[in-house]
Amino acid sequence: EPSGNSLSSALNELLDKNNNYAIPKVAIIFDDFKSSLTGGDDGLIDNVIEVLNTVKVSINSVTENNNWTPLHFAIYFKKNPAVSAVLILENKDIEARTSIMLIVQKLLLELYNYFINNYAETLDEEALFNRLDEQGKLELALIMHNK
């Protein structure tokens, strides 16, 4: 199982990348990573809890229609620690909000690939697969085929 430190390192590596991946609608089962997140010292869980308390969103919710999962927020706050959940939620500039969404979704896909490639044996891949929409399943199949 990934440790808090390895997740922290993974996030730092991913945040430095500027990739051109397609952005599938991937629903990560956040509970699978909660234990590794709480093992870190970078405050990711605190940020996630702040968002949960602010927006009352399910930890297993899927990103669509500009709704972020807590994992999206955790990654975004990792890169921008000074930004608060309230400022993001109150942002009425749809173009700016969408632009941020695209950046964070690319990071989420990178993180998803990292776990699939490095910790596949610890994840319930069938459960992950069942949480994807049809487009996500097609794109995940391509990812797995090209591993």
Swiss-Prot record:
First-listed, main subcellular location of the protein, grouped into a coarse class: secreted
The keyword Membrane belongs to this UniProt entry's keyword annotation: yes
Expression tissues: Expressed by the venom gland.
Notes concerning its domains: Two helices (H2 and H8) are predicted to insert into membranes and form pores by assembling into tetramers. The helices are contained within a helical bundle domain that undergoes significant conformational changes during pore formation to allow exposure of the transmembrane helices and transition of the toxin from a soluble monomer to a transmembrane tetramer.
Additional notes on this entry: Iso and Leu residues are assigned by comparison with orthologs.
Domain of life per record: Eukaryota
Family: Belongs to the cationic peptide 01 (latrotoxin) family. 04 (delta-latroinsectotoxin) subfamily.
GO MF term list: RNA-directed RNA polymerase activity; toxin activity
Subunit field text: Homotetramer in membrane.
ANK repeats: 57-59, 66-78, 79-96, 98-125
Protein known as: Delta-latroinsectotoxin-Lhe1a
InterPro entries found in the cross-reference section: Ankyrin_rpt-contain_sf, RNA-dir_pol_PSvirus
GO cellular component: extracellular region; host cell presynaptic membrane; membrane; other organism cell membrane
Protein's cellular compartments: Secreted; Target cell membrane
Gene3D superfamilies listed in its UniProt record: Ankyrin repeat-containing domain
Biological function: Insecticidal presynaptic neurotoxin that induces massive neurotransmitter release at insect (but not vertebrate) neuromuscular junctions. Native toxin forms cation-permeable pores (with high permeability to calcium) in lipid membranes locust muscle membrane and artificial lipid bilayers. May bind to insect neurexin-1 homolog, insect adhesion G protein-coupled receptor L1 homolog, and insect receptor-type tyrosine-protein phosphatase S homolog, and induces neurotransmitter exocytosis both by forming tetrameric pores in membranes and signaling via G protein-coupled receptor.
Keywords: ANK repeat, Cleavage on pair of basic residues, Exocytosis, Membrane, Neurotoxin, Presynaptic neurotoxin, Repeat, Secreted, Target cell membrane, Target membrane, Toxin, Transmembrane
GO biological process: exocytosis; viral RNA genome replication
